[in-house]
Regions:
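Active-site anion-handling motifs in enzyme catalytic cores
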Residues: 1-285
Length: 285
């Protein structure tokens, strides 16, 4: 049985996307063992290369040997997808799949990051639906959809998909409001990854609690994302981060590690570390 996987990447600087991809692959491998079936998985992205595959396989305890990659060129409309010759290989590989699982990066099936990103992801879904390939919308966040045309397009995709899975109750409620479909509620697939204690971070001081804080570059740095700068937030994110760290540093039994899960977070991490030199930073890789 051939399975396609879109919207979850191994060749990506976003560690959340990598965790998403490895978790889905791990789940599919467990299904293979339990159901005694063979699944051939194709990730629709460029291959990250042998060294990265071996690293992820080792560190995340996932077998990454028996699946293939199909490079994907995203487009803004189906007319372009239908006519551009350089998409032929991608379209042929999509058609070979018995079903396709879409993760949309976990939280990008929305227009909160702008309409450009939404249409990037959604046109490929529409193509899959038009070709009558069963589409499973995997555990992810849905919405919000602020633009009316975006909401109508999202409703179409949700209702035409074979299975719709959400990873939070807010998304479940939102889907009930905008679409006529029975969505399934589960947890974020990243919880499927094993927790490995025993690395150097846990050996520095065994008596103290190790607290990791991800400082979001998108929210902490000014003008980092034009689509987010237009939003109104209930909380001042920069003030929240400062207050949280200040309170934790008052405790003698805590050791704080500032973490970036995408490359642009590291500028924010470095700025915060200068303000709070007692905090440790974990190098982004």
């Amino acid at each position: 049985m051939k399975v396609g996987l879109i919207g979850a990447f191994l060749n990506n600087s976003n560690m959340g996307c990598v965790a998403l991809a490895c978790s889905i692959i791990r789940l599919l491998q467990e299904i293979e063992e339990e159901e005694k079936i063979k699944l051939d998985v194709t990730l629709f992205e460029a291959s990250p290369g042998k060294e990265k595959l071996e690293l992820y396989s080792r560190e995340l305890d996932v077998d990454l040997q028996n699946f293939s990659f199909s490079e994907t060129a995203w487009v803004y409309n189906l007319r372009a997808l239908a006519h551009w010759k350089r998409h032929e290989e991608m379209k042929a590989n999509l058609k070979k799949c018995d079903f396709i699982i879409d993760m949309t990066g976990g939280d990008s099936f929305s227009d909160i990051y702008g309409k450009k990103r939404f249409y990037f992801w959604s046109n490929i879904k529409k193509y899959i639906i038009k070709k009558k390939i069963p589409l499973i919308l995997g555990p992810q966040t849905y919405g919000p959809y602020e633009n009316k045309r975006v909401k109508k397009f999202a409703k179409y995709i949700i209702e035409k998909s074979s299975v719709v899975i959400v990873r939070d109750e807010k998304s479940l409620k939102y889907i009930k409001e905008i679409a006529n479909v029975q969505a399934k509620l589960t947890t974020d697939v990243a919880f499927q990854l094993p927790c490995q204690k025993g690395t150097e971070i846990f050996l520095n001081n065994e008596k103290k609690k190790k607290i990791g804080i991800n400082v979001s570059g998108l929210l902490y740095l000014e003008n980092s994302d034009s689509s987010l700068s237009e939003k109104s937030f209930k909380t001042d994110y920069k003030e929240y981060i400062h207050d949280l760290i200040s309170e934790l540093l008052k405790k003698d039994d805590c050791e704080i590690y500032l973490i970036g899960h995408v490359k642009c977070d590291m500028e924010a991490v470095e700025k915060v570390q200068k303000l709070y030199p007692k905090c440790h930073t974990i190098p982004w890789q």
